[in-house]
Amino acid sequence: MNRSKIEKVLNNTTEKDLLYIFIPSYNRPRFFIGRNLLPMFTDRALSKVYIVVREEQYKEYKKENRDLIKRGMNLIPIPKGTVTGVGSTRQFIMDYAIENRLPYIMDMDDDIRYLQFLYRGKTNSGKECSKHTGAKDYKIDPLIPQKVLQLTGKIAREVFRKHPEVLLGNIRKQRFSNPSENSNIRYQINKGPTPRQTKILNMKGIKRAGIRMPDAFNLHGDDIGFAAEVLQNGYSCFNIPCLCYDYVDEKNNSVVRDPHNPDKNRHLHKLEYDGLMQMEIKDYLRESFKFPDGQYMFGDIDWRAYHKLHGTRYYIKHWKTKRK
């Protein structure tokens, strides 16, 4: 889809299309998305944003984010002793959503730096590709990040309504070069990247299925661990390729891994791997990165292996385009 068409689609969204957006944060009261993206949101949009922090850090977060809170952003304290890691924090968010009867939510990391859309373009060599907007575009339209999330919500509701077996999704991680097909796809099911960092959750379906975050991923691997739980229970994941995000380099910004303690990091990655090896995903896990000695570092869903195992196929929904 060309730029003018996707911009028209984005401009036809409103704050009503936003999902409830939960952003867990720990030890970072001046978290990146709160410093750089949320101030560009409208007050009405901010009222659908929930920052989730531990009770002992609540006052500091409230002080650092008082301007956004005055404009409508919500700050939720997690009672002391309720969570002990990232996995239990994600579960707290899901429990909160269920308790408050929120049908669909986003669970987004606090270090997201850009929210962009893709459009049809060409490389310097003339090859067709999907280009993405950048920070310079925010100067022309500062509501781009909000509109991206509005369209995310609009598409997500469509997916969950038409495909109730889908419980989890996300938008795509920004790449330097994007396949030309991406800007033409509205959404795809059981294909594409593992849902991470900008997760979209069908809480109605998750409650009905009784799915919870596995305890094995409390300290590390919560994203892929939860996706594995969804899939092994017979449910599906989706992705929105025409929308993308970028984040702050985790090597310098992680609250879990310590760049100065490689042994601790190895232990965390091994915990993730050992947990995944106890699940069905062991049969369709692609080991994306390894330490120099070959130990597992990061993994993703191998959709080809998944479909071969289950005898299924992916599904792609394209944008409707008028024929000439």
Predicted regions, residues:
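Short hydrophobic alpha-helical runs that function as membrane-insertion/retention elements
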Residues: 49-53, 237-239
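Active-site-proximal specificity loops/subdomain of glycosyltransferases
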Residues: 53-106, 113-131
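Short, well-formed alpha-helical segments that are part of the catalytic scaffolds
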Residues: 2-10, 23-44, 57-65
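A structural signal for short, well-ordered beta-strand segments and their strand-loop junctions
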Residues: 104-108, 167-172, 237-241
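Hydrophobic targeting segments
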Residues: 17-23, 38, 48-51
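C-terminal catalytic/acceptor-binding lobe
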Residues: 1-6, 10-11, 17-19, 27-31, ...
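Short catalytic/ligand-binding loop motif for oxyanion handling, primarily in non-cytosolic enzymes
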Residues: 31, 59-60, 113-117, 177-180, ...
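Conserved catalytic core of nucleotide-sugar-dependent glycosyltransferases
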Residues: 113-224, 232
